[in-house]
Amino acid sequence: MLRLTLASLGVAMNNLAATYSDLGRHQDALVMGEKTLEFQRRVLPENHPDIGISCFNLGISCHIVGDLHRALQFAREALRIFQATLPPSHPHVTQAQQLVLRYEGDTARRS
């Protein structure tokens, strides 16, 4: 039961990071997203899909603030986790694949 409570706390933290982003507080979203990921890595199994969601969201936050290298790293990690834990047709897998392709293109154009 405690693990479920801790997992729920991670989801709430991730939701707070998303809310910051929705409000245009992108630096706050990035900080909260990093805290969320750190927390989830302590309390969840290594390839838990919630960790993938946090990586996905952090990728978006990094991209918004202009850190394309980290954005691509987080997007790739999200994709790796989703491919390891979800069926290939799951929307998270598709969204992460699209994000990786987009960020690879952005990174190549910036080089």
Predicted regions and their residues:
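Intrinsic-disorder-linked linear interaction elements in eukaryotic regulatory proteins
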Residues: 1-111
